[in-house]
Structure formats: C-alpha cells, structure tokens
Amino acid sequence: MVEQHIASAFDRDLEAIQARIMKMGGLVEAAIMEGARALEARDEELAAKVVKDDAAIDGLEELINEDAARVIAIRAP
C-alpha cells in the first residue's frame, strides 16, 4: 500500500513537471513565431515584446529545473 502511495506521488510530481514543460513549449513556439514575424516585417516593437516575454520562459525553465532537482533528490536511493 505504501509503495502504491509513493508511486502515485512520484507520478503526480512527474505530471506536474510535464505540464510545466508543455506550457513552456507553447510559449517558446509562440516566441519563435512572433520572432520570425518581427524579423520578416522588421518590426522592432514586436521584437522587443518577444525579448520581454522571454522572461516568462526563463521563469518556467527555472521552476522546471528546481522541480526536477527536488524529485531526483527525494527519489534517489
């Protein structure tokens, strides 16, 4: 019973990390599209927005790294 509880908690931790990775991937995809559009149109305002919005991607990356390190530390033998 305890093993199942531990496995369920581990699965939840992995699912939370995966959800953040998927969210970050969506933000990266949007940034690439907007960046390409800004380049093509030589739109400096849009390019500046892409650079500014990169902070959200960086923040998610930091959270993902922290979560992954925590899961590894907790689950390591």
Labelled PLM ranges:
Residues 1-77:
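Cytosolic, long alpha-helical scaffolding segments
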